[in-house]
UniProtKB/Swiss-Prot annotation:
UniProt-recorded Gene Ontology molecular function terms: GTP binding; GTPase activity; translation initiation factor activity
GO annotation terms (biological process): translational initiation
The family this protein is said to belong to: Belongs to the TRAFAC class translation factor GTPase superfamily. Classic translation factor GTPase family. IF-2 subfamily.
UniProt-annotated location(s): Cytoplasm
Alphabetized HAMAP family for the sequence: IF_2_B
Function (record text): One of the essential components for the initiation of protein synthesis. Protects formylmethionyl-tRNA from spontaneous hydrolysis and promotes its binding to the 30S ribosomal subunits. Also involved in the hydrolysis of GTP during the formation of the 70S ribosomal complex.
Designated name of the protein: Translation initiation factor IF-2
Region of interest: G1: 129-136
Region (G2): 154-158
UniProt-annotated stretches for the region G5: 266-268
Organism of derivation: Mycoplasma genitalium (strain ATCC 33530 / DSM 19775 / NCTC 10195 / G37)
Span list, region G3: 176-179
Keywords, comma-separated and alphabetical: Cytoplasm, GTP-binding, Initiation factor, Nucleotide-binding, Protein biosynthesis
Length: 619
């Protein structure tokens, strides 16, 4: 990819890639509009936005594309190619400018450390696994074996991570926010913090849902895994069964001819703890984790909060360089000089070296967890970068959807592997879609199912999709509005499908670079919820009266409460009295079951609708 001038200037600065004053001008927003007969733009715009920037009537723009076989609305997004086509048609020259953003400045500052400047740093470890398998107990036991009772009881603040030493006095950093949600949230923001994942599995319980999720998340991040089989003190412990279960995830112990480190032990008794620490350090040496200790510092925020007396504070892990008191730090929308620095025991520090977790204060506003921090020489430059972050947060709602961006990338051959995540109502549905995906064959692009499980889509699934750039599909299960809102906020493409062949066809069309068909929602009928029943096998049954139109079994539907959408799904069952029916007309009472909907109340409105294809599109 061709780098713009601002990147070159950032890279050429003498000390650690700090930003020169001349680069400030490159950081200013490129203004979209017509200048001297040239339409300057930064990226895709809606028809309405293009019209307002060029003073061309919306109707004329829509007419132009309609005559060329493309039906658009005022809110349709014009691609870069379509904008160029419109400019030519309406008599403008055009020029696309690349805007320098907070993300690409932070991500692309190049640190060219020669090998002689690098020194080993402690490995950074996250513990993951199923709930109740002993993640927290393991962390506590490791912590207790490395501090005195007085120190352990006297911790003054929780900073999200801590360091321990093994019997050879070698250091390991543990992130003590166990769970794959925190792990993936960091990765979704581009943060490569964790070096090694310790996967905890209970010897008396085996592989569970969250175990599988944790494996998917770690493998998706290409993070090495060490398996700790916990609860070996239990009389029902069966480590061989656990090992057999893990084989299907390509986690095979070295003793069985594999490459994965397995440690047997007990967080309760302390069995295997020293062996685990030694193996973490051994793997760290093999992987060769290094950093330049003498450089300006950078790293990641694992937690942020407000402290009485200190204001906004951030719990950070240093990944490069040495962070010092008085350093000017940028962290997301916040910047400031490091005013105080403490370790996990509340000890005041003057500096922090690579892999060291510390709590720092001195920010002007609240930072953002998961973002990268960087030290700058010039406070004005720091303020400029922080302000850039704020501006982009405001503009986020106007950005391209993930789906359209994905298709642009596929068209431009920037994506060679498309990641997929499936959640389904049953294992049978999962097996069916897996088989369907295996049969999809598009030249030069491959499909990778990075996670598939039975159950509703969770926030964890959304964060994994964001972190891995995956498409997320729900099979035969509706979505709550909360989940949809989270997906929208994170920019994740999320779809519900009730027909596996159609889903497979859509995935194939995406790979071929086709746009989704343009659909129009046609309201079929509307019903008001008057009563509620609960059936142990069916779930919630809504007693309704059809207010308008007709309701059909199998209709897509939306559940409204106070004019807000609460749930979207499908009508699975209709009953008149106790008789199953396929259709209910206006004025009649009926019992309605909405697939996957658990939140329904008297007074809610159910709107049944159908989707009709208006027009197919192509990139």
């Amino acid at each position: 990819m061709k780098k713009n001038r601002a990147f070159n200037q950032v890279k050429k600065t003498k000390f650690d890639g700090r930003i020169k004053t001349s680069a400030k001008h490159q950081l200013r927003n490129v203004k979209t509009g017509v200048k001297d007969g040239v339409f300057i733009y930064k990226g895709p715009l809606t028809v309405s936005e293009f019209a307002s920037k060029t003073n061309i009537a919306v109707a004329n723009i829509i007419k132009h594309f309609f005559l060329n076989g493309l039906a658009l609305t005022v809110n349709s997004v014009l691609t870069n190619e379509q904008l160029a086509d419109a400019c030519v048609n309406f008599g403008f020259d055009f020029k696309m400018e690349t805007e320098v953003t907070h993300e690409n400045i932070v991500a692309n500052i190049q640190f060219e450390d020669s090998d002689d400047l690098l020194q080993p740093r402690p490995p950074i470890v996250t513990i993951m696994g199923h709930v109740d398998h002993g993640k927290t107990s393991l962390l506590d036991t490791i912590r207790k074996t490395n501090v005195t009772a007085k120190e352990f009881g006297g911790i003054t603040q929780k900073i999200g991570a801590y360091q321990v030493k093994n019997h050879q006095n070698k250091t390991i950093t543990f992130i003590d926010t166990p769970g794959h949600e925190a792990f993936t949230l960091m990765r979704a923001r581009g943060a490569k913090v964790t070096d090694i994942v310790v996967l905890v599995v209970a010897a008396d319980d085996g592989i569970k849902k969250q175990t599988e999720e944790a494996i998917s998340h770690a493998k998706s991040a290409n993070t090495p895994i060490i398996v700790f089989i916990n609860k070996m003190d239990k009389p029902t412990a069966n480590p061989d069964l656990v090992i057999q279960q893990l084989n299907k995830f390509d986690l095979v112990p070295e003793a069985w001819g594999g490459k994965t480190i397995f440690v047997m032990g007990s967080a309760l008794t302390g069995q295997g703890i020293n062996e685990l620490l030694d193996n973490i350090l051994l793997l760290g040496e093999v992987e060769g984790y290094q950093a330049n200790y003498n450089a300006h510092s950078s790293g990641y925020a694992i937690e942020v909060q407000t402290s009485k007396g200190l204001g906004p504070i951030a719990n950070v892990i240093v990944k490069r360089g040495t962070l010092k008191l008085g350093d000017i730090v940028v962290l997301g929308p916040a910047y400031g000089r490091v005013r105080t620095m403490h370790d996990e025991n509340g000890n005041s520090l003057k500096q922090a070296t690579p892999s060291k977790p510390v709590q720092i204060s001195g920010f002007d506003i609240m930072p953002v967890a998961g973002e990268k921090f960087i030290v700058f020489d010039d406070e004005k430059d720091a303020k400029l970068i922080a302000n850039k972050f704020k501006e982009q947060q405001k503009q986020k709602a106007n950005n391209l959807t993930v789906n359209q961006t994905l298709k642009e990338q596929i068209k431009n051959k920037e994506i060679k592997i498309l990641n997929l995540i499936f959640k389904a109502d049953s294992d049978g549905s999962l097996q069916a879609i897996k088989q369907a995906v295996e049969n999809i064959n598009v030249a030069k692009i491959s499909l990778s199912i990075i996670h598939a499980a039975v159950g509703q889509i969770s926030e964890s699934d959304i964060m994994l999709a964001k972190a891995s750039g995956a498409l997320l599909f729900s099979l035969n299960l509706g979505l709550s509005q909360t989940v949809k809102n989270i997906a929208s906020l994170q920019g994740v493409k999320l779809e519900v499908h009730y027909h596996i062949p159609k889903l497979a066809e859509e995935i194939e069309n995406i790979l071929k670079g086709q746009l989704d068909p343009v659909y129009e929602e046609i309201e079929i009928g509307k019903a008001e919820v008057l009563q509620l029943w609960f059936h142990s096998k069916i779930g919630n049954i809504a007693g309704t009266i059809v207010k308008s139109g007709k309701i059909k079994r199998g209709n897509l539907c939306k559940l409204f409460r106070d004019k807000e959408i609460i749930f979207e799904g499908r009508i699975d069952s209709l009953k008149n009295e106790k008789t199953p029916v396929n259709l209910i007309e206006t004025g009649k009472n009926c019992g309605i079951v909405i697939n996957g909907c658990n939140d329904i109340k008297i007074g809610d409105i159910i709107v049944a609708y159908e989707k009709q294809i208006v027009k197919d599109g192509k990139l």
